Amino acid sequence: MPATPASEMAPSVSLSFANNFWGKEDAGVDPLLERMHNAKITSDELKSFYTQRAAIEEEYSRKLLNLARKPLGSSEAGTLRMSMDVVRGELESMGKSHQHIAQQMKGELEEPLSTFSGGIKERRKIIQNGIEKLLKTKTQQTHTVNKARDRYEQDCLKIKGYLAQGHMVMGQEERKNKAKLEKTQIQMSATSSEYEQAVKVLEETTARWNREWKAACDKFQDLEEERLDFTKSSLWSFANISSTVCVSDDASCEKIRLSLEDCDVEKDIASFIKDSGTGQEIPDPPKYINFCRGDINDNASDVSDDANYSVAQFQRTMNPA
């Protein structure tokens, strides 16, 4: 089968607003205007989402910073105290990081979206107001054409009726019928002119509407493409910002883990014994003294058993658990 010449192929129609929103009774207007309205709803919802997400970060950062100021291991010592100090310090860093994220979400997401949406809204209103005004005029003129056509059609039907009746009446009735015919013919001339003029006016308005609606479709598509690109980029930035704080939190947690690797249980026990130990001497219990027998000098002011003690040399008993 021979190939079909390119010149004989049906022209391709681009998938655009301007080629797909027409139809009887301007059927394409409502879906397209609804799309533009829904686009505004999406932008408003996204702005609210960013606002609330930033507020969550602010609240979380505030709670982290408050927690970081509270004592942690204030009575502790040694390497565990050092690790706890790192925990508090990194908690403060995490709080500041989340605080910065909240500011980023406001400055890099919420505010640019608000500015962009405001600009889109103004441009859409200008296009939509012009279209709605022209569509109202076109609708009114269509109504005028329909009414003029109905009047003209009724006059034509009356004339046909009078002409048909003229062959069936005579005398006085014939004269009356002729008078009505002449009157209706004069009236028909006027209604015909009105109808013709209304059609001409509507034809001009329709041509103008077709031009302006096509231009509006192109502009609406421009707005939609800009909005979709902007929203995609904005959400991409949101994901990047959100992942940044995850990386920051993980870095702080890694510092905590590293400090815990330096936490030495035996070293802390030895340090506590060295700093606070009270000695190995276990005093013997006091012995009975017979004062009547004179086991002690009567002039002694007290009784001392300092020299009587044993040295602690116990074996450590481990917890079986």
Label for each model-derived stretch:
Residues 2-31, 35-42, 49-52, 56-67, ...:
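Membrane-associated scaffolding surfaces of BAR-superfamily helical dimers
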Residues 42-46, 90-91:
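Glycine-/proline-rich flexible loop or hinge segments
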Residues 63-168, 172:
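Long, charged all-alpha helical bundle/coiled-coil segments in cytosolic proteins
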Residues 165-167, 173-184:
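Long, amphipathic, heptad-repeat alpha-helical coiled-coil stalk/linker regions
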Residues 1, 9, 36, 82-84, ...:
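Detector for methionine-enriched segments
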